[in-house]
């Protein structure tokens, strides 16, 4: 049994196997990395949306920037990040991933890429979010509840009070956390290399 499911009700048979697969972090990350290359290797010139490539690249860059931004605030299992991107959503790294994946689907241009991405997100992300929330609540019981009640999981609320820039907290961003603790620049370079390959065709 995965340590991610130790606190969950016990299951057996096929239900147990499927749940273990859905909670398996390495599988989720590996498949996500593979999908980047697959979507970029197989591309259609007849894109579903006109000028999709420009919009898609913008979406990918925004997703990468979101990941870089978020990774510079988080220190896994040692502190509860509630500032910067974590003032808007509880899981900004996943938000960035979704933007990147949608952008790659648009670049790919085939219907099957959207179906594949949807199945991937549906299969892995609800359990990943559930586990992260459960873990953080256990590690930081005094602060997690209030923060989670005010902060959505993936989609930020509309900021109507005009304080969005002060909430960004860019001065607290740390390259050391992003580079050393989370290896985020490696992911950025990997995705950008594949996008560059597509653009050279």
Question: PLM features: what roles do these ranges have?
Answer:
Residues 1-83, 98-201:
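Membrane-anchoring alpha-helices and their flanking helix-loop junctions
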Residues 86-87, 91-95:
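Glycine-rich acyl-CoA binding loop
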């Amino acid at each position: 049994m995965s340590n991610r499911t130790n606190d969950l009700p016990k299951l057996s048979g096929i239900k147990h196997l499927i749940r273990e697969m859905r909670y398996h972090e390495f599988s989720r990350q590996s498949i996500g990395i593979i999908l980047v290359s697959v979507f970029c290797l197989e591309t259609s010139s007849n894109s579903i949306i006109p000028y999709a490539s420009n919009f898609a690249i913008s979406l990918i860059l925004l997703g990468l920037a979101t990941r870089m931004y978020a990774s510079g605030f988080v220190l896994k299992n040692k502190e509860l990040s509630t500032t910067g991107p974590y003032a808007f959503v509880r899981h900004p790294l996943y938000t960035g991933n979704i933007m990147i994946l949608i952008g790659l689907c648009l670049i790919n241009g085939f219907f099957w890429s959207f179906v594949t991405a949807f199945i991937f997100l549906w299969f892995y992300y609800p359990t990943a979010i559930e586990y992260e929330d459960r873990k953080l609540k256990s590690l930081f019981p005094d602060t997690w509840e209030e923060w989670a009640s005010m902060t959505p999981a993936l989609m930020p609320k509309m900021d109507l009070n005009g304080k969005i820039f002060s909430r960004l907290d860019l001065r607290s961003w740390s390259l050391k956390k992003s580079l050393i603790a989370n290896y985020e620049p490696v992911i950025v370079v990997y995705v950008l290399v594949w996008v560059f390959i597509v653009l050279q065709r």
